[in-house]
């Protein structure tokens, strides 16, 4: 089980990303727009850099929703590989079967 502080930190990051998503998208659109003046694009870049670091979605880490494990997490289920195995063997994930060929 991951430390509760690490799990809460990730939750806080997710809220920050959601809060600044629209503003980041607008600024990035201005920066990418070649028809805008260089000064305007430069100001947009400065504003983007002034946003909090945790507003960037790249800083988020996928964690297991049960254990908080940061590695080996499947996006489709939101669970770590070990927990997927346990739950799948109990038959609690519909449509998931053990591979055999």
Swiss-Prot record:
GO terms for biological process: translation. GO terms for molecular function: rRNA binding; structural constituent of ribosome. GO terms for cellular component: cytoplasm; small ribosomal subunit. SUPFAM superfamilies: Glucocorticoid receptor-like (DNA-binding domain). The keyword RNA-binding applies. Keywords: Ribonucleoprotein, Ribosomal protein, RNA-binding, rRNA-binding. Pfam families: Ribosomal_S14. Belongs to the universal ribosomal protein uS14 family. PANTHER family: 30S RIBOSOMAL PROTEIN S14, SMALL RIBOSOMAL SUBUNIT PROTEIN US14M. Binds 16S rRNA, required for the assembly of 30S particles and may also be responsible for determining the conformation of the 16S rRNA at the A site. NCBIfam families: PRK08881.1. Part of the 30S ribosomal subunit. Contacts proteins S3 and S10. This is Small ribosomal subunit protein uS14. It comes from Polynucleobacter asymbioticus (strain DSM 18221 / CIP 109841 / QLW-P1DMWA-1).
């Amino acid at each position: 089980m991951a430390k509760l502080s690490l799990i809460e930190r990730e939750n806080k990051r997710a809220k920050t990303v959601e809060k600044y998503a629209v503003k980041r998208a607008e600024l990035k659109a201005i920066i990418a727009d070649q028809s805008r003046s260089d000064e305007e694009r430069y100001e947009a870049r400065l504003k983007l850099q002034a946003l909090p670091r945790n507003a960037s979605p790249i800083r988020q880490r996928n964690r297991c929703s049960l254990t908080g494990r940061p590695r080996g997490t499947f996006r489709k289920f939101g669970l770590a590989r070990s927990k997927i195995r346990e739950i799948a063997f109990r038959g609690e994930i519909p449509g998931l079967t053990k591979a055999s060929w």
